[in-house]
Amino acid sequence: MTLEEIVSAIEQLTVAELAELVKMLEDKFGVSASAPVMAMPMAGAAAGGAAAAEEKTEFDVVLKSFGAKKIEVIKVIREITGLGLKEAKDLVEKAGTPDAVVKQGAAKEEAEEIKKKLEAAGAEVELK
């Protein structure tokens, strides 16, 4: 199986199946797909809290609400994530919950671009 075939197979999975795949890979290889919570010692974190906030380079794009234009927001979600119609609709309907993450670990520029596209479609978005 080539890498292209693997990517093609992964593209066909639902969000729930992708989450299960990630869990299986984490268990199989003994790793975690989540970003580390604390990268510096406690004393450094207390002293440089404001500086740490400015230096953040990865953001999670979270959908807070889809507003009055649900269909437009679904279209933008599909464009950004490559999800199928059902998966994109399910994600949009989770707006306001912790599960409504459109993109995890996005670079600052990418996260701001995604936020701009979603807000133009009528959604309320938060960068975490």
From Swiss-Prot:
Taxonomic superkingdom: Bacteria
GO biological process: translation
Keywords on record: Ribonucleoprotein, Ribosomal protein
Gene3D superfamilies (UniProt xref): 3.30.1390.10, Single helix bin (1.20.5.710)
CDD domains (alphabetical): Ribosomal_L7_L12
UniProt GO MF annotations: mRNA binding; structural constituent of ribosome
Keyword Metal-binding: no
Recorded GO CC terms: cytosolic large ribosomal subunit
Signal peptide: none
Pfam families in alphabetical order: Ribosomal_L12, Ribosomal_L12_N
The protein's assembly and partners: Homodimer. Part of the ribosomal stalk of the 50S ribosomal subunit. Forms a multimeric L10(L12)X complex, where L10 forms an elongated spine to which 2 to 4 L12 dimers bind in a sequential fashion. Binds GTP-bound translation factors.
Function in brief: Forms part of the ribosomal stalk which helps the ribosome interact with GTP-bound translation factors. Is thus essential for accurate translation.
Homology family: Belongs to the bacterial ribosomal protein bL12 family.
Name of the protein described by the UniProt record: Large ribosomal subunit protein bL12
UniProt organism field: Thermosipho africanus (strain TCF52B)
Species classification: Bacteria, Thermotogati, Thermotogota, Thermotogae, Thermotogales
Gene name as annotated: rplL
